[in-house]
Amino acid sequence: MNIKKLFSRMGSPSLVLTFVIACPFLLFICQSHSVAAYDLDYGKVYEDSKVVSKKLNLSVYYEALNPSCATFIVKNLARIFDNGLNTILNLRLIPWGNAYVNKSSNAIVCQNGSDECQLNTLQACTVNVLRDVNKHFALIYCFEFLVIEGRYKDWRTCFSSLGLNQKPVLNCINSVNGTKLEQKYAIETAQLNPPHTFVPWVVVNNQPIGKDYNNFTAYACKAYKGNSAPIACQ
């Protein structure tokens, strides 16, 4: 996926300018990656076993309308595509956070209201439908940028800005699949050990890094046992 071309389609000059400032990987043309097939729990990744065995799992547990989560994704996490860290990571985005299921109504309740529930499901479907991490991260980056700008209700514009077809993602949201994805994320988040106490909750190879989440690169580099360390680890 050519990230530079992808973001050059964005219609908002302020969005493009801020992306350049916050995330230099706009100028970086990502190397091609094998396409991974994710099942509904986003826990199984089917790729070349030799590639997967050398990669680290970087899991980010977050919620769509949380300001700290949006800032982390836009201004920090996005840098992995510029400094090469993405080449040693299986990036997993789990949009559930502090949501819970109301036991009497079985309805999902989100910390920041029903809009956040919709955006959590939107992002869960984005990851599930757009299996290429470059594509689904670019779209989620756009969603979270709009959260920072206070324009999150304009999320549909991200599809047109990036030249992506919204229909498959919307079909997921409006079907039972969207709910199933969120239910599985709820179970996964509840099984965190130790339990998460805030968001974003960042886990490197099953090791939570707590309040030092903005320094996740150092933890990833320390955990990496491969032979070809990316620029970020040198």
Language-model regions, residue ranges each:
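C-terminal cap of thioredoxin/glutaredoxin-like
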Residues: 2-23, 30-35, 58-61, 147-234
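Juxtamembrane luminal stem/stalk of type II transmembrane Golgi/ER carbohydrate-processing enzymes
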Residues: 35-41
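Structural alpha/beta surface segment adjacent to cysteine/selenocysteine redox centers
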Residues: 54, 58-166, 228-234
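Sterically constrained small-residue positions within well-ordered secondary structures
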Residues: 49, 82-84, 193
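A short beta-strand-turn-helix
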Residues: 41-56
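A compositional signature for long Ser/Thr(±Pro)-rich, low-complexity
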Residues: 26-28, 41
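Eukaryotic intrinsically disordered and solvent-exposed regulatory patches
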Residues: 44-46, 77-79, 182-190
